[in-house]
Design a protein with these regions (language model features):
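N-terminal catalytic or cofactor-binding beta/alpha core of small enzyme domains
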Residues: 1-108
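Mid-sequence, gly/pro-rich, charge-dense loop/helix-turn segments that line enzyme active sites
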Residues: 61-62, 76, 117-127
Length: 127
């Protein structure tokens, strides 16, 4: 069973834009999303508890508060949410994880923005 546990109940979001930053090729999405979180000084909003995600906890810098490896951060002023993960989502966990994220987005009338990298395509004759 998948669940998203909201820890910042006082934040109000109206049809937010969700920036997805899962680790992928070149970590482009992860790095860009982490930059957005830092730039807007976003608040830790919620954590994911999904079957198949590694059972680990993480902490950031000097803050020793343990958090799940997949988290949502929010900026109420900009109606912005960032989906951040310190672990890749396995192929086995992907369907349930995707359903969990999709349900949350539908419930909050959110607009997703997906970030990912692409490998460099070699031109013919290029070494």
């Amino acid at each position: 069973m998948s669940a998203i546990t909201v820890v910042a109940e006082d934040l109000e979001l109206e049809s937010p834009t969700v920036v997805e930053g899962l680790p992928g090729l070149g970590l482009v999405g992860k790095i860009a999303t982490d930059h957005v979180i830092e730039t807007f000084d976003m608040t830790y909003y919620a954590g994911f508890d999904c079957e198949g995600l590694p059972r680990i906890a993480v902490y950031e810098g000097d803050d020793r508060t343990l958090r799940p490896p997949v988290r949502l951060y929010a900026d109420e002023e900009h109606d912005l949410v960032a989906l951040s993960s310190d672990v890749p989502v396995s192929a086995e966990a992907a369907p349930e994880f995707a359903n969990c994220v999709t349900r949350w987005m539908q419930d909050h009338d959110a607009t997703p923005l997906f970030l990912s990298g692409l490998p460099h395509q070699k031109q013919e004759g290029q070494v």
